[in-house]
Regions:
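Short amphipathic alpha-helices in soluble, non-transmembrane regions
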Residues: 590-598
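Active-site-proximal helix-loop-helix substrate-binding element of RNase H-like nuclease domains
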Residues: 32, 40-187, 415-434
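Short glycine-rich phosphate-binding loop at a beta-alpha junction
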Residues: 82-91, 97, 251, 386, ...
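Short hydrophobic beta-strand that contains or immediately precedes a catalytic carboxylate
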Residues: 5-7, 111-112, 382-386, 617
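Conserved "right-hand" nucleotidyltransferase catalytic core of DNA-directed polymerases
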Residues: 1-36, 40-48, 127-131, 142, ...
Length: 632
């Protein structure tokens, strides 16, 4: 792999505009310079004091105020010479090029992200992560400490000739360090993890384009939802006042005052503490308390109503007003969690200088009235492709449990199976009754779904009761929770063996790897007492949850070469689903064809493994996220 490092410096006419590539389209932002760097065995060095520690040298250079043609020339040269373009947070750089009108040239090239390579090598759960920042300056300080601080003295605003040249030199140094670090990281990756890296990197142009394009949102629907939610907030607060007349909105919005109310005045038992040792009142704590105390349930209802109003109505309207083009732009982040999942950030900056560029897309509620405000662009339809039973199927593969594997075959229903086992009734009869709309059968299947989705990660009996009450509206007695917990272990006997195997591997090697090659670093035994449970849980959860992320990246890599046949585009991704937009005239065919493609991904070619089961994809289409209909 021949690398060419690439880095842009940008500016804009408004605060934060220099970090918003879509502003190029309106002329409100621009690239002030870009720099490139390559290893050069001939020893030619454009920047004399930026040299590589190996025998090779670096040929580097930069261009001030590049034109579209200048950027096109660079991209065309890389394509013709079969170079892989590497950046640091490469999606950002690629997005600026796409905004300049160079979509075709960006897609024609291979891309890599040095920052993500570093994450692959050092990936760890939050509890044991040593690296707190994956910025380029942090990497230079860690691997080339003698050269740290090279950014000192750079003025990013001054326009005198000396300052401009100093910024250009800094830009070139960024490119050189990106090249050196990427080369170092690649040399430390074995073949299987490298496969995961390259598949992930194949998605960079698609994610960059989605960053520029944004997501259409209906301000009218967001405002209508807001009116409904304000009434919900009003009613919820009336309930709060009936419960305790001394409670005010200020108390409910202050963690300190809320803690004093719950654990002081009301005498409830704290569930956990914050980093400072104070009793926590986060969502998990309130969910737990609400499951057992009606007063806490009312407080939770109020806080959720207030949060829903702000997050799903007010913030949408604020983002639409800020962007000014009918779109919200939550910023997608590849490999954002330790499991590899993509997430979205909704804002830039903090406090009074906060820029509401997007919405909290990865936290969006399921209700149709919430989702209907997310629409396809005019003339397009929204297509959703969702991996059916994704985590259940991967647990079946990892645990090799024969019952689980059988339940992944066509015509089977794992939730009805578990529901029948819990209720001690006939599985096939329950399936039939569910299909006929029998409410009793549906309730039994719901218990089966609770068991299947909650217990495969070693959930305790007590936690199962909380999940049942909060997420499913099912109050369970201790005896019922115990029976579901035991039934799960009886039906899927290989799953507890998988748990033990993963804990053993983690303690022996300190590393867990999924089937696609993605790794997480834990620590070799002996483990401190306070980390034993979270580390063993990571060893169990990671192969299942992370392979779901890699399955998504593989799907996107396949779609990169497929969508153009339908004039379709990647829109966003969420949980188990991928969202595509296609012209209305081609949407039906695209939905059917892409469903077939995604249901038969090239796992053997990509990961070198033969899977014992299929991973079918469900498809939906419609004008908005809240109006999607199934595609058969």
């Amino acid at each position: 792999m021949e690398l060419t490092a690439f880095d842009v410096e940008t500016t804009g006419d408004g605060e934060w505009y220099g970090l918003q590539p879509w502003r190029v389209i309106t002329g409100d932002a621009r690239i002030t310079s870009f720099a490139t760097a390559e290893f050069d065995a001939s020893g030619s060095v454009v920047v004399p004091d930026v040299a590589c520690e190996s025998k090779a040298r670096i040929r580097a250079g930069g261009l001030l105020n590049p034109t579209t043609e200048g950027a096109r020339k660079f991209l065309t040269s890389c394509h013709e010479r079969k170079r892989t373009i590497v950046g640091w947070n490469t999606t950002f750089d690629a997005a600026w090029l796409i905004a300049m009108g160079l979509r075709e040239e960006v897609y024609a090239n291979h891309w890599l992200d040095g920052m993500l390579l570093w994450k692959h090598l050092t990936n760890a759960p939050e509890s044991t992560r040593l690296i707190k920042s994956y910025g380029l300056k942090s990497a230079v300080a860690r691997y080339y400490p003698q050269e740290a601080g090279y950014e000192a003295g750079v003025d990013f605003d001054a326009m005198d000739r000396a300052s401009v040249q100093k910024r250009l030199r800094y830009n070139i140094q960024d490119a050189c360090f990106t090249l050196r670090l990427t080369d170092l990281f690649l040399s430390n990756l074995s073949e299987l993890p490298r496969r995961a890296v390259l598949l992930e990197a194949a998605c960079i142009p698609m994610v960059a384009e989605a960053t520029v394009s944004g997501i259409c949102a209906s301000g009218e629907r967001a405002a209508a939802l807001g009116e409904k939610l304000r009434e919900v907030v009003r009613i919820a607060f009336v309930k709060v006042k009936i419960t305790d007349g001394s409670v005010t909105p200020e108390i409910l919005s202050s963690p300190k005052q809320l803690s004093e109310l719950l654990f002081g005045k009301w005498g409830l038992t704290p569930i956990k503490t914050t980093a400072t040792g104070a009793p926590s009142v986060d969502k998990e704590v309130l969910d737990t308390l609400a499951a057992f105390d009606p007063r806490a349930a009312i407080l939770r209802e109020y806080r959720e109503a207030v949060n829903n109003l702000k997050k799903f109505s007010d913030n949408t309207l604020a983002s639409l007003a800020y962007n000014g083009d009918g779109r919200v732009r939550p910023a997608p982040r590849i490999f954002s969690t330790y499991t590899g999942r993509m997430t979205y950030s909704s804002k830039m900056g903090t406090g009074s200088k906060e820029a509401p560029v997007g919405i909290a897309l990865h936290q969006w509620k399921r209700g149709a009235e919430y989702r209907a405000q997310i629409t396809a662009p005019r003339g397009y339809e929204l297509l959703e492709f969702d991996f059916s039973g994704q985590e259940f199927r991967w647990m079946a593969v990892e645990s090799r449990d024969q019952t689980m594997l059988k339940l992944c075959e066509p015509g089977e229903d794992a939730h009805s199976y578990m529901g029948a086992a819990i209720a001690q009734c006939n599985y096939r009869h329950l399936m039939q009754a569910v299909a006929e709309g029998d409410p009793v059968a549906d309730g039994r299947r719901k218990l089966g779904k609770l068991g299947n989705l909650s217990l495969q990660y070693r959930t305790s009996r007590q936690r199962l009761q909380i999940v049942a009450k909060v997420q499913y509206g099912l109050p369970l007695t201790d005896e019922e929770s115990e029976e579901i917990w035991r039934t799960y272990r009886r039906q899927y006997q290989n799953v507890p063996l998988y748990w033990k195997r993963q804990e053993y591997l983690a303690k022996r090697t300190g590393v867990i790897q999924n089937l696609a090659g993605r790794m997480v670093n834990l620590m070799q035994a002996p483990w401190p007492d306070h980390l034993t449970w979270p580390l063993s849980s990571t060893a169990i959860n990671f192969p299942i949850q992370s392979i779901g992320a890699d399955q998504k990246y593989l799907a996107l890599a396949v779609l990169r070469n497929t969508l153009s046949a339908y004039d379709a585009y990647f829109y966003f991704e969420l949980h188990d689903g991928l969202f595509i937009i296609a012209p209305r005239a081609k949407a039906e065919k695209a939905a059917h064809d892409l469903k077939a493609v995604l249901s038969d991904l090239p796992y053997k070619k990509a990961w070198g493994i033969d899977l014992p089961i299929k991973f079918p994809v469900d498809a939906k289409r419609g004008p908005s996220w809240g109006e999607l209909k199934g595609v058969k």
